[in-house]
Regions:
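N-terminal signal peptide c-region/cleavage motif recognized by signal peptidases
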Residues: 4-5
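Secreted/extracellular ectodomain signature
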Residues: 8-136
Length: 136
């Protein structure tokens, strides 16, 4: 029975094998649309400043911040544009499970967003791999 439960759990994406000079993880855990927009603004500014080849950036959402990554979000075009530059987005499976309890079904994410078992743990893993955390 444990084996089948593990198969259903979100698989942790592997840590990026990157030679980027700047490794950054950004946290979004706030439901405030202003803060969510700020995270996207900062990400866009970092891409412009460092260039996508000199920087590896992952935006990790957990708690109410996951709303930023839900399908149909007003920021979907901006998220897709950042993805096109190589920015990665990860959403917390724990949060999605809690949303499902409230909504009666799991919400859909914007296509291309990874699901990680625990958003906070993902940030810790990336920190341990040399990433610096930004929380605008």
């Amino acid at each position: 029975m444990l084996v089948s439960l593990n198969v259903l759990a979100a698989q942790e994406p592997p840590l990026p094998d990157t030679f980027a000079e700047h490794k950054i993880v950004m946290q979004i855990s706030d439901p405030n649309p202003f803060k969510q927009t700020l995270v996207l603004n900062v990400a866009g500014n970092l891409v412009k400043y460092y260039g996508s080849t000199n920087m590896d950036l992952e935006i990790v959402a957990f708690g109410p911040g996951v709303r930023l990554m839900l399908e149909g979000n007003v920021n979907t075009p901006r998220i897709k544009a950042l993805m096109a530059t190589g920015v990665r987005f990860s959403a917390c499976e724990n949060t999605l499970t809690n949303f499902a309890k409230i909504l009666g079904k799991k919400p859909k994410l914007i296509e291309g967003i990874d699901i990680v078992p625990a958003g906070a743990a993902r940030i810790i893993q990336l920190n341990e791999a040399g990433y610096k955390t930004l929380k605008p």
